[in-house]
């Protein structure tokens, strides 16, 4: 299995934990959906396997509307053909899949005052479900999604949800999923008042030292963390293009 096959298999496994189903939608176009996480867009998208047409896009929009959804998301490994993109006014985002193919984690600087706890070995549910930092209008949705993740993490030993504490305060969290020689790291978050204190790298090094396999993550091509990841030894192994439309 090459590195991209392994990463794709790990991604599919992670989605399956949350009930995401993949099925053919039209020729050259697959659909992924999940009824388990109603507030999550990530597990509901269309995935072309060939160049898509305006008709494909319209069919996907019609399908989403029939399901009572107000958006459509296409995720692909090539840019969308400009006439298709411009006909509908998609918002575009580019994501990099970055993998640590040669382990350099021993060189990462950490913060020795940070205590890291894993849902697999600690009762940290209250800390993980704390949504006080989320804007009030989004708290209910955030809590529901976190509770679903917590339920999966508590019943699947390969799924790690880590909490970083300093002086008794939760200052950061991250997910990690082990699957057949690959480890996906996702949703690295550090409390705003505690940033630039090596908390993120402390969480990442903990994952590298306590899991087995090639560590990989997804980084926004337009954001600065990708540059930090590159300095840490992560390499871009795939570029993913996302096209989002809401009505």
Residue ranges and their predicted role:
Residues 1-14, 44-51, 96, 104-147, ...:
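Short amphipathic alpha-helix that is part of the acyltransferase structural core
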Residues 50-115, 120, 225, 243-245:
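Acyl-donor-binding surface of acyltransferase catalytic domains
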């Amino acid at each position: 299995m090459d590195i991209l096959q392994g990463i794709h298999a790990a991604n599919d496994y992670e989605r399956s934990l949350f009930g995401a189903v993949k099925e053919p939608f039209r020729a050259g176009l697959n659909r992924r959906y999940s009824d388990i996480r109603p507030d999550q867009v990530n597990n509901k998208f269309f995935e072309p396997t060939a160049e898509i047409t305006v008709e494909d896009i319209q069919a996907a929009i019609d399908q989403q509307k029939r399901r009572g959804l107000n958006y459509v998301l296409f995720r692909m490994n090539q840019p969308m053909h400009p006439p298709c993109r411009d006909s509908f006014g998609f918002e575009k985002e580019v994501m990099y899949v970055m993998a640590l193919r040669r382990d350099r984690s021993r060189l990462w600087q950490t913060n020795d005052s940070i205590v890291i706890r894993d849902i697999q070995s600690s009762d940290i549910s209250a800390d993980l479900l704390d949504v006080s930092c989320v804007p009030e209008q989004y708290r209910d949705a955030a809590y529901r999604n976190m509770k679903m993740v917590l339920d999966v993490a508590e019943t699947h030993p390969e799924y790690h949800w880590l909490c970083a504490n300093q002086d008794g305060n939760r200052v950061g969290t991250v997910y990690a999923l082990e699957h057949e020689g690959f480890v996906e790291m996702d949703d690295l978050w550090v409390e705003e008042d505690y940033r630039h204190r090596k908390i993120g790298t402390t969480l990442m090094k903990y994952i590298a030292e306590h899991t087995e396999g090639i560590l990989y993550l997804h980084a926004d091509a337009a954001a600065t963390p990708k540059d930090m990841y590159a300095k840490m030894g992560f390499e871009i192994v795939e570029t993913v293009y996302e096209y989002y439309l809401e009505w």
